[in-house]
């Protein structure tokens, strides 16, 4: 299950196909659905699969070739350790929190076998606008979701309060100009997600 074939990333300067006609890819994108992190369990990706996931994640539009993102991985015992600290921070900043609410925060990162934090790491004084650099980090998150699904895993992209908490950012070693684009939870679905209502896109055509 979830076996990884031997895929090879192109080398710099190598010519690559401009298009990849693939009904399977269209089917995946047409029916892709996030799975709630609470419904993600073992097994998670192997080390080889994680390496490939991160490689795919970085194959996004990147104005200026800046690669303005980085990853922090949470797996194994590190998930519970980080969760315990989250619980302490939440308890300190939310004095009215109940024991059950604190426990919920402590268990945030053990819901899935693997959590990948995608850090938007922009160059603030670069000619490429910060907004465009941040969009690239968002595309990285989406690539992780799609690649995880293609590997046979389920995933969810979340932020939650701890993506914006200054103490959590310090704990994770974020530098000036860095923001958490999201936490991508990856594992095996314990149940199939149900499709949600999706609003119709507002589409217009510009006319001279």
For each feature predicted by the language model, list its residue ranges:
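N-terminal amphipathic, basic helical "cap/leader" segment at the start of enzyme domains
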Residues: 1-111, 208
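Conserved hydrophobic/aromatic beta-strand scaffold that supports enzyme active sites
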Residues: 28, 115-117, 183-185, 205
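Small-aliphatic-rich amphipathic alpha-helix that forms the alpha element of a beta-alpha
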Residues: 57, 116, 122-171
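Short, charged/polar surface micro-motifs in flexible loops or helix N-caps
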Residues: 76-81, 87-88, 122-124, 166, ...
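A glycine-rich helix N-cap at a beta->alpha junction
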Residues: 108, 172-198
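Generic beta-strand structural signal
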Residues: 112-114, 151, 180-182
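Phosphate/diphosphate-binding glycine-rich loops and adjacent basic-rich segments that engage nucleotide
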Residues: 195-208
